[in-house]
Amino acid sequence: MKHVGPVEPAAGGPEVPPVAALGAAPESAAALFGPRLATAQRYAEVLGTAGVERGLLGPREVDRIWDRHILNSAAVAGLLGRGDRIIDIGSGAGLPGIPLAIARPDLEVVLLEPLLRRSEFLTEVVDELGLAVEVVRGRAEERPVRNRFGDRDAAVSRAVAALDKLTKWSMPLLRHDGRMLAIKGERAAEEVDRYRRVMTASGAADVRVVTCGANYLRPPATVVSARRAKPPHPKSARTGKAGTR
């Protein structure tokens, strides 16, 4: 098992709080992660130490790793079907993909991350936690990524980009009727109103804002859900039955 370690800290780099600052896992974590709670606890420790040292998480986030990051991510699990194949776009420190993989071992999870240092961190974390998760260095808009992962049941993301870009990246990675699940902030509804036309033009349907984890998160996770619509039937130039101009 490979240990997730720090990089050499630069002068004036972030001061890493002690692991004790994380505190014990909240009771809701035991309900979400069940027998894999120890794995979730270890992930929290990695985020609060190596994650801070390597610039993937701010030092001020350590005391709220559970509520703001891990539980906020895992709350989306209730929106996923059994055995769903999901791709985490712009995974960064592994949010939301790693908490979902811990909470739901039935899921097939791919972590997609374009930056080398982040993808290396993700590979180390996945190895240390013993997760059956694939880490891929790449961007959602790249053709090789779309060719390989263009049939996912769900594309998840968290604080990656505005909905216009995120929809354009997500839809080509989904099977028809697959869903984009984007964890957003409290202004998610405003963002949906702003970009609804662009989202529809990019193939999104049934766009709505849902909340998850309201019984244990304050505030609950706010998620923009959108289904990939089936494309219209292509016109047939050979038969001449394409319709009128």
From Swiss-Prot:
Family: Belongs to the methyltransferase superfamily. RNA methyltransferase RsmG family.
Transmembrane segments: none
Cell location: Cytoplasm
Positions of the UniProt region annotated as Disordered: 223-245
Pfam families, per the entry: GidB (PF02527)
HAMAP family linked: 16SrRNA_methyltr_G (MF_00074)
Protein name: Ribosomal RNA small subunit methyltransferase G
Organism superkingdom: Bacteria
Keyword Mitochondrion: no
Keyword terms of this UniProt record: Cytoplasm, Methyltransferase, rRNA processing, S-adenosyl-L-methionine, Transferase
Gene3D superfamilies referenced in this protein's UniProt entry, alphabetically: Vaccinia Virus protein VP39
Biased composition (Basic residues): 227-245
Organism: Mycobacterium avium (strain 104)
One GO location term (cellular component): cytosol
Biological function: Specifically methylates the N7 position of guanine in position 518 of 16S rRNA.
A molecular function (GO) term: rRNA (guanine-N7-)-methyltransferase activity
